[in-house]
């Protein structure tokens, strides 16, 4: 295939230096309703929440806009393209609703009712439109946090049989398009003491994922699996940042005992003087 003559490319001369700030990456928080996904995301610096569950962020001290349909979705992303210094962290709450807006618009354009199956053409058009939207979002110079509810799915095992797993409520197409951009998928849940934690390493029951290699480590360099979120979003955010910088379980150095040699020598001399008098 012939190349266009006006195309100019250059091979890199140096290795990429990864960002040290977690807010520069693309994250996914998922869990059941009212588990604290949005309130945790609202702790990130200079955030802006596009709220696809209108009213969900109204109780938070945050900057947000309720989004009601696909046309508004495209309009807000276009505005952010024009105002690239508007925020540092963009929160999409929640991403399955964005996909539903997209599919709803496709049905409308194809003259189908909401109860009608979209058919092959509908799924194909929706996939292309949604994929373009995610590309547009990912090119914005902000960190991105997507949220989703949880859902139980039956997964086939390699050796045969199935197992039920908790994962995001994203549909197959939505998940296929978005997953490749996400570095960390954290599942927010409650532990046996009824305290909130974020699981960032997957197991046979929960599909969480940590793509960071040199972060979220314990002092012995084993991976952190769960991050305690405490009793408030502020504590949760603080612990998340500490865990990212490998400081959540940092061993505290024992305090040094300072000895004043001058005073010690004076005390010894005084005791010796007293003994000589005896």
Residue ranges and their predicted role:
Residues 21, 80-85, 136-141:
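Conserved catalytic network of the ASCE P-loop NTPase/AAA+ motor domain
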Residues 2, 18-27, 59-66, 115-122, ...:
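Short, basic, glycine/proline-bearing loop/turn elements
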Residues 144-222:
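Phosphate-binding/switch region of NTP-binding enzymes
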